[in-house]
């Protein structure tokens, strides 16, 4: 399917989430792409699926949503990825990630190699960099991305794929670094999350990596944004949680759109992202249907 020329690329895993409520398309970079698309931003998913029924169905779903599949390669031997997700009584999800799958070997398609030269930004995560093949592909994209394009690094530490040194290297040169409070605490001090330390951790990470914008999410407590040396905090609002799968990805999509649009204050950008993330937490799965017009 050919869609409008995308302004953003999302590099990384695309897979199936095996949830108690059913099978849902997932993978953080794909989830972000879905929400960018639903919120009116052009995007190209850069990933891989297998030559199997699950891969066929993923592509069919994306095309049905109007997403361009030209950046999704087909791996001849490896299967389409999936994770087994368990949701707790309060809606929090934990994951068992299956290894040696198609998204571990992302091949950059001709469409990706053409569009990266005019992209406004590249969103990439840490999980897909568990393979050296993908790490090389990511560096290939970063090397030819326009100088003024945003480099958005979405940390996703999932044991055993949680190398702090790799995360620090990938964060260097990023325009925006996004991670949760537990990940920030681990990277900064090696300790557990502690409420109230988000600003200090964000400033430490900004100084360590040189990243000018650091966002730390803290679940239902809210989220913080460090930008141009100024710290902003937006408290979470109570919602009826169905599950939290994809809420952080929807948050990131909204934050990126708002910050890149440069029409709202940084505090307003953060608040908008929180509200959209909260709405997704009231829905099942990472890719809920948006209201007509995509407005929330």
Each model region followed by its residue ranges:
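Active-site beta-alpha turn of Rossmann-fold NAD(P)-dependent dehydrogenases/reductases
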Residues: 12
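Ribokinase/PfkB-type carbohydrate-kinase core domain
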Residues: 1-9, 61-64, 69-74, 89-231, ...
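Ser/Thr-centric signal marking residues that sit
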Residues: 80, 217, 244
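Conserved post-catalytic alpha-helical subdomain immediately downstream of the catalytic base
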Residues: 6, 17, 38, 44, ...
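Short, conserved glycine- and acidic-residue-centered signature motifs
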Residues: 25-29, 134, 248
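A general structural signal for well-ordered alpha-helical segments in protein cores
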Residues: 29, 33, 55, 81, ...
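A short, flexible beta-alpha/helix-coil linker loop
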Residues: 15-17, 129, 158, 183-185, ...
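Substrate-binding N-lobe of the ribokinase-like
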Residues: 17-92, 97-103
């Amino acid at each position: 399917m050919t869609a409008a020329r995308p302004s953003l690329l999302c590099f990384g895993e695309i897979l199936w989430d095996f949830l108690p409520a059913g099978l849902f398309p997932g993978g953080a970079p794909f989830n972000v792409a879905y929400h960018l698309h639903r919120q009116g931003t052009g995007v190209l998913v850069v990933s891989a699926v297998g030559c199997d029924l699950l891969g066929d169905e993923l592509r069919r779903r994306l095309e049905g949503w109007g997403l361009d599949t030209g950046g999704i390669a087909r791996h001849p031997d490896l299967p389409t990825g999936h994770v087994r997700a368990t949701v707790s009584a309060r809606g929090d999800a934990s994951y068992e990630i299956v290894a040696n799958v198609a998204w571990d070997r992302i091949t950059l398609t001709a469409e990706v190699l053409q569009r990266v030269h005019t992209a406004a930004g590249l969103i990439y995560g840490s999980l897909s960099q568990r393979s050296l093949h993908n790490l090389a592909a990511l560096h290939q994209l970063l090397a030819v991305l326009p100088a003024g394009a945003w480099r958005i690094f979405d940390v996703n530490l999932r044991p055993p794929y949680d190398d702090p040194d790799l995360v620090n290297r990938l964060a260097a040169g990023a325009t925006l670094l996004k991670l949760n409070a537990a990940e920030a605490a681990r990277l900064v001090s090696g300790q557990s999350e502690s409420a109230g330390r988000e600003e200090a951790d964000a400033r430490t990470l900004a100084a360590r990596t040189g990243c000018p914008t650091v966002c730390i999410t803290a679940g239902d407590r809210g989220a913080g944004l460090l930008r141009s040396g100024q710290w902003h905090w937006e408290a979470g609002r109570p919602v009826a949680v169905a599950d939290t799968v994809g809420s952080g990805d929807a948050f990131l999509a909204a934050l990126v759109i708002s910050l890149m649009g440069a029409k709202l204050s940084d505090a307003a950008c953060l608040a908008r992202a929180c509200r959209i993330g909260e709405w997704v937490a009231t829905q099942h799965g990472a890719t809920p249907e948006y209201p007509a017009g995509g407005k929330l």
